């Protein structure tokens, strides 16, 4: 039986094939593949093989080192947020390479168990879909305790490309890196993209792909970015699928809100009877720490709603548990948010509901910006059905988001309840 390559296998092969090629760099340091292999070896020497995950917090560089080192010692790796709660280590089933803690934006965080096979399938599919070649450079400013940031290590090392690590997102620091280095790939969440556009940063000619995910991308933001020359690839994925499982490219035709294209690689997509997105394929996790997560037939039923057209293209329409019932009609916050994002004077927006004796769920828009309520209402009257129009507007200095840019829905509901009518 053919063995499944691990992150450590990628590194060993790359150090043999491209020993002097850049492997990883920060804003201050850089390592070739041969140098990075030696650096990882010094960390691996003090790691004992075990079925208990090695739980590590620290800088992005720390997490990158330990990801490779744990792989070389066949030890499950579990990166965690430096500001998060301590997580007890427990023995895992054989074959688990990585444990990623979900964001918890929709409930309690859970540990997602991923195998080398999951991670290899995800890296291979991504590298084919958004071609990643030896000598390319992927700028990674996402947190490495989340799958979106960490998976870039697998993709680049598998391809013989290099990773440019940033310690979090800073628009000016990112602008400097884009000017100084031949960056070909970049991963962002929509809030980061909006900040780049607001500061007037332009994309370099070397940039081929900007992977955008982690939260809904508003059409107005997409249009602004495309007009400014940013080569966007809206994507869909999660910890449970080892990152992106569908990503829009020009081959999928014109983009519209929520469109993420066809499934990558050998993954399959379908919809449950209630409209939830179901996924099956080699990227699907082994399960959650403590059990559960994947049906016996291999299908993962997500908490996301979607539509699949005749060409097999997926459009994500929102979270199933965010659905509001306003005036007897189903209203999804994402639909209203996409509309409001284009309203002049609104820089950021989220929509939720509060209980109401007349409407059932009263639609509440939480807005960052200077658009007055009357202007917002006028904007919505010609663009949204009556049941979906916000009946209450709450102005905020900022919206509650987690480290990956996802809206914290429970915090939004609390803010809406606490706001004065």
Predicted regions and their residues:
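Conserved AMP-binding/adenylation subdomain of ANL enzymes
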Residues: 120-137, 145-185, 199
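Gly/Ser/Thr-rich phosphate-binding loop
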Residues: 185-188, 196-255, 268
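Conserved AMP-binding A3 loop
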Residues: 32-34, 97-124
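Conserved AMP-binding/adenylate-forming core of the ANL superfamily
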Residues: 2-3, 7, 12, 20-48, ...
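Conserved pre-ATP/AMP-binding loop-to-beta segment of ANL
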Residues: 2-8, 20, 87-101, 108, ...
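Conserved AMP-binding/adenylate-forming
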Residues: 3, 29, 44-81, 141, ...
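Conserved ATP/PPi-binding loop(s) of AMP-dependent carboxylate-activating enzymes
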Residues: 259-266, 272-298, 319, 331
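AMP-binding/adenylate-forming catalytic core of the ANL superfamily
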Residues: 281, 305-388, 398, 405, ...
């Amino acid at each position: 039986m053919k063995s499944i390559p691990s992150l450590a296998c990628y590194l060993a092969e790359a150090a043999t094939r491209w020993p002097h090629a850049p492997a990883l760099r920060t804003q201050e340091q850089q390592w070739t593949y041969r140098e990075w292999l030696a650096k990882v070896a010094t960390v691996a020497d003090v790691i004992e093989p075990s079925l208990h995950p090695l739980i590590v917090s620290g800088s992005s560089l720390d997490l990158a080192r330990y990801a490779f080192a744990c792989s070389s010692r066949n030890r499950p790796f579990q990166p965690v947020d430096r500001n998060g709660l301590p997580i007890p280590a427990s023995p895992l089933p054989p074959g688990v390479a990585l444990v990623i803690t979900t964001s918890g934006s929709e409930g309690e965080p859970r540990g997602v168990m991923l195998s080398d096979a999951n991670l290899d399938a995800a890296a291979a599919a991504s590298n084919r879909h958004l071609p990643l070649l030896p000598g390319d450079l992927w700028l990674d400013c996402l947190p490495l305790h989340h799958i979106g940031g960490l998976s870039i290590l697998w993709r680049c090392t598998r391809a013989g490309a290099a990773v440019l690590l940033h310690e979090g997102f800073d628009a000016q620091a990112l602008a400097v890196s884009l000017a100084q280095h031949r960056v070909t790939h970049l991963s962002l969440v929509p809030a980061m993209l909006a900040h780049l556009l607001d500061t007037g940063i332009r994309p370099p000619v070397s940039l081929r792909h900007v992977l955008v995910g982690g939260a809904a991308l508003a059409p107005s933001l997409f249009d602004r970015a495309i007009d400014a020359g940013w080569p966007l690839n809206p994507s869909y994925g999660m910890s449970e699928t080892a990152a992106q499982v569908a990503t829009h490219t020009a081959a999928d035709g014109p983009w519209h809100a929520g469109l993420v294209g066809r499934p990558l690689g050998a993954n399959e997509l379908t919809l449950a009877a209630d409209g939830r997105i179901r996924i099956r394929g080699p990227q699907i996790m082994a399960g959650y720490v403590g059990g559960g997560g994947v049906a016996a037939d291999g299908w993962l039923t997500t908490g996301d709603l979607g539509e699949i057209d005749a060409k097999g293209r997926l459009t994500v329409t929102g979270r199933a548990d965010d659905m509001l019932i306003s005036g007897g009609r189903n209203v999804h916050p994402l639909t209203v948010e996409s509309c409001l994002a284009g309203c002049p004077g609104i820089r950021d927006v989220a929509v939720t509901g509060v209980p109401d004796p007349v409407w059932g769920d009263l639609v509440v828009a939480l807005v960052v910006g200077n658009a007055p309520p009357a202007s917002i209402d006028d904007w919505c009257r010609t663009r949204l059905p009556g049941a979906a129009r916000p009946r209450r507007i709450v102005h905020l200095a900022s919206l509650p988001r987690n480290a990956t840019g996802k809206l914290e829905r429970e915090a939004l509901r609390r803010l809406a309840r606490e706001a004065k009518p």
